[in-house]
Amino acid sequence: MDRGLSTGTNQSGAGLRERAVTSQADLNVITENPTVTNASNGKDKAGKTFGRTPDGTVFTVPQTHDMVSQLLSPSEPKNLSDLVVLTILAGHIFLLWILPSGAKIPVFAVIYLFWRSCYNAGIGWLLHNQSHHKTLVRWAEKSQIFVNPATGKNPYPQLYHLIKRELEIKISKDYSFEEAPLEYNTWLVFRRLVDLILMCDFASYCLFAIACSRHPANESVLMTVIRWTSGIALVLFNLWVKLDAHRVVKDYAWYWGDFFYLIDQELTFDGVFEMAPHPMYSVGYAGYYGISLMAASYKVLFISIIAHAAQFAFLVLVENPHIDKTYNPPPPRKRTITEHDAASQRSQSPDTPNAPSVSEENVPNATTFSSPPPAVHNLLGFHNLDLHRITDTSSILVQFLMFSLTVLTPSTPWYQFLFVANAAIWRLWYSVGIGYLLNRQSNCKSWTRHFVKYGETPHEAWNQWKGTYHLSMVMCYASFISAVWKMYTLPSNWGYGLAILRHVLGAGLISLQIWTSVSIYESLGEFGWFYGDFFFDESPKLTYNGIYRFLNNPERVLGLAGVWGAVLITASGTVAFLAFLSHILSLGFIQFVERPHMQKLYGRSLRQDAGLVKSLKRSLPPSLRQLHGSVDKIFDESYEFIEEIIDTARPKLAAGVNTFVRDTTALFQKYPARVTISRIDADLAGYDLRDYSLTVEASQLPLDEGDLSKEGDNARTPLDRRGDLENLVFPYGTPVKVKWTAPLNHSKKDWIGLYKVTDNTSREVTRVSSQGRWVAVNEGFYDNLTCERGILISDVVVSTSQGDNGEKHDIATGEVVFSGDKLFWTQGVFEFRYHHNGKHNVMAISRPFEVRIPRFEEEDHFDMSQTAVETSLLPVIQNCFDRDPEIAPETPEEQYGSLVERDGKFAKRVVFAVHQMFGVEFAPEVVRSDGNVRNLAWRICNAKRVLAPYSMSRDGATTPTESKE
């Protein structure tokens, strides 16, 4: 139901805070949940909508109605499932009536939490598995409940006729149960389950609120009127959000239809979806808090917060991954067709420039810095914390010092004054000081010029600026938190007054600011967060995605919600002064620093009204729209007046400052355990283990006996092999094909898993989880698709002579391939195990095989050939990228596919391989930044040259070695 996802694609326009983002970020178009409108191109002249199943089947999507109309409208036909839902709802109401007063609240709290769990956990689990494995459709396919009993293949004919009657009663036009695709019928049945859960969820919540409702003692009439008026207003607003959302998304997205099939229509971005991100999950829960107000119960408020948090978890864990997979796939890679084209592209400076060749390295070139450096080592986030970096170390030390002083000093008026003054000074520096530096950088590039004057590069100036801004931001908020700590007093009586409400609202505002900051960072990236367009004059390009789709300057209000949350929690006038100062200075920063630069950089392309403002303006009467324009004009004229005063006073202030400095100079010189359950099938009679076998095939590395000079005398002789079998040594990441044999009556749920040899002590039973590294031997017998990826051939009948008397008999054989996530991305010795009937009984074990990354041998670190490195590195990277033609390069200069930037697992595989091959350790961000094999090879060669003096290997430049014979 609650599809908290906006509809449509990005809209171009203009806004103040949306700074330019890097080119890579521009590729990541953040598309909210697509929905359809009646005006879309996917309808024919008769107004019919067409759907498309995953196998390409096109069908007419009949018109359906929302669940409230279906259940409660007398004009809508009723079926058995409607009566079941209405009966259960009536049972809830009857239960509230018969329960004693003392039992109503706990009983309905449990009932509501049960239905909420069914919603977020139950439906979430079903949708997650449907998205990844088509589980619901596979259940319907395996059970054959939608197959006509006349064919004799439906084991449940009565259930078939019941479902057919139930669905056809509801959908009278453009629908035939027999002809509708399996996916659509499955979705219709899933809808009935959703109707039951969602109606019971909301009904039990309302009944719980009724059970908890009370009239506070000594509450004035005015407060009662305000409380009920506000509550009713929130409920009505919630109702409008739901109705407008359903108008836009229809039943298709309301019931998660895109988990089952897609609509052949254009995407839209309309109505409430212009107002807020994920409106069904954000503002769509305003009614819960309105009901809490009317009930005047903290119990209702807290259970509303729990429900709201669970809904956001549902969004993050279920819906967002499905949306990214369905509507935001990585764009196709631009391929290099010929060597001539590759040379042409290199000469035209592509987005990721290729590293220089050996002959080019020593030629001095004038480097241009119009584009920002690639983001390799970001600053923000705990996952980017690096104690080797002075910015991070300084930030941690100053915060530790600040909070230590806060905790160890008493909260006397004198110390309170010092901490408040410290917070005010840091806020002034963060807004006025940083604003002045950015203004000078915008007008005359003063920050960059300073570093260029001392021989540094603009990239160094950019890095130093990021450190300065980051430390200033950290100290601004650390000092504010310290001041709030000093001014806060724990309530002596939590039940008196509005103490609990103040803390709940304050915590909510703080959470809102944190979410806003995270959303801004996700939209702008590291480059935009640190005002990169003040430093690099790349071609101006605005994007309006994420939170900027709805607001031009989210930090103007939402970005400072947390400071006002601190005011509510402390109930302190001093903290209110700090919050007011912070808000005024932030507004001034936007008006006098950001806005002039944005207008200069982007001009008329700036958007005047964001999505929220447009929605509000459309809902206002003409007289109020005119008043809004007049107010905007007054504010603009006021800002212009203040700017004129500052421009006039600037020379006088400068002269006064110079005099003050001159006089002053004269006076002063101067940082789980998992439980595995092995399932055993006791009935193994009738299966001949000699018919089971596993044979491993893959491209092999040349055998290397190793360096025997360290061994004893007897161990230095070459291995004496008695037989034709040799060691199996496979390259890192290469797909491994497994040929299996089994009796003809083998279970169709048999499966093959990949394990480290040392992980299992038993040869009869596997007691270690496969962790997803397994493939079924037959298709269609498991409720997910992942286990079937890799099946090549199944149940081919062949003859064999194995047996006691050597007689030939038939067995089944097949082939599967393990690749990608089904492999161990490390070195070691592994084996495959054939398991029986979906359990962990081992029927056959393959020969052990070794996965090895060959060490790159170079004669001299200083003469290391980049071409040789490229040649050795290319096949390894192709394996690391699953040999996927959409992302794996075919030549050293070909760019990686965009999925490498999104999914960090590919870069992690590469850096592990590079570390083992060359002894050089890189961060995964380096692989993504380099963008192709040639750049990475150049970086490896350069790193080897830099680290050669510190090498302790036998061939190290500073290590004396014996002369080679």
Curated annotation (Swiss-Prot):
Keywords: Endoplasmic reticulum, Lipid biosynthesis, Lipid metabolism, Membrane, Methyltransferase, Phospholipid biosynthesis, Phospholipid metabolism, S-adenosyl-L-methionine, Transferase, Transmembrane, Transmembrane helix. Residues 104-106, 214-220, 296-297, 416, 492-503, 581-965 are cytoplasmic. It is an enzyme of class 2 (transferase). Belongs to the class VI-like SAM-binding methyltransferase superfamily. CHO2 family. Residues 1-82, 128-192, 242-274, 319-394, 438-470, 525-559 are lumenal. Its EC number is 2.1.1.17. Residues 34-54, 326-368 are annotated as: Disordered. The chain crosses the membrane at residues 83-103, 107-127, 193-213, 221-241, 275-295, 298-318, 395-415, 417-437, 471-491, 504-524, 560-580. Residues 344-368 have a biased composition (Polar residues). The gene is choA. This is Phosphatidylethanolamine N-methyltransferase. InterPro entries: Phopholipid_MeTrfase, Phosphatid-EA_MeTrfase_fun. It is a multi-pass membrane protein. The keyword RNA-binding does not apply. GO terms for cellular component: endoplasmic reticulum membrane. It is found in: Endoplasmic reticulum membrane. Pfam families: PEMT. GO terms for biological process: methylation; phosphatidylcholine biosynthetic process. It catalyses: a 1,2-diacyl-sn-glycero-3-phosphoethanolamine + S-adenosyl-L-methionine = a 1,2-diacyl-sn-glycero-3-phospho-N-methylethanolamine + S-adenosyl-L-homocysteine + H(+). Catalyzes the first step of the methylation pathway of phosphatidylcholine biosynthesis, the SAM-dependent methylation of phosphatidylethanolamine (PE) to phosphatidylmonomethylethanolamine (PMME). Pathway: Phospholipid metabolism; phosphatidylcholine biosynthesis. GO terms for molecular function: phosphatidylethanolamine N-methyltransferase activity.
